[in-house]
A protein has these predicted regions:
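Beta1-alpha1 glycine-rich phosphate/pyrophosphate-binding loop at the start
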Residues: 1, 30-42, 51-53, 80, ...
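Ferredoxin-type iron-sulfur electron-transfer modules and their immediate structural context
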Residues: 1-115
Length: 165
């Protein structure tokens, strides 16, 4: 179940802000986990979302689907005591809060660098399309299926990743 605002802040305040954060080492994309958690702990949800957006276009997906117990949470120093920071739940909270409140919208630069076609609208296709759009490319995504989403839509069960995302 998703965290409430109060639960998310309390959970974020448990972070020890390690000098050598294992959570970043355990994250395949090296998210700045301590910084986004610190901002969340202070109630700066928009800033936390901005930090996440620096590395991922899909925090709502990553917060639900990534194997946190093997990655960021598995490398959390508090894991030694059996209770690591619930990083995935915090990422999910920030992404959902942003979607509900419509807080952050990145400024997309003018499309001056040419046209790019992306084949497939799964997580990789959506990520590269978003990154290229932020670099000023005009991006067209092609998808063979009736609905975009790839494995996000067709390969992950509804209870794990709601289709509305």
């Amino acid at each position: 179940t998703p965290l409430t605002m109060e639960e998310a802040i309390v959970e974020a305040k448990r972070c020890l802000n390690c000098k050598k954060p294992g959570c970043i080492t355990g994250c395949p994309i090296s998210n700045d986990i301590p910084d986004f958690i610190h901002q969340l702990s202070r109630g700066n949800f928009g800033e936390a979302r901005t930090i996440l957006a620096g590395k991922t276009n899909l925090p709502a997906v990553c917060g639900r689907v990534c194997p946190h117990e093997k990655q960021c949470e598995g490398h959390c120093v508090l894991n030694r005591a059996g209770k690591p920071i619930r990083i995935g739940k915090l990422e999910q909270f920030i992404a959902d809060f942003d979607a509900d409140m419509n807080l952050i919208r990145e400024k997309i630069p003018p499309k001056t660098r040419g046209n790019v076609a992306v084949i497939g609208s799964g997580p990789a296709g959506l990520t590269v399309a978003g990154d290229l759009a932020m670099m000023g490319f005009n991006v067209t995504v092609y998808e063979a299926e009736d609905e975009p989403g790839g494995v996000l839509l067709y390969g992950i069960p509804e209870f794990r990743l709601p289709k509305r995302l």
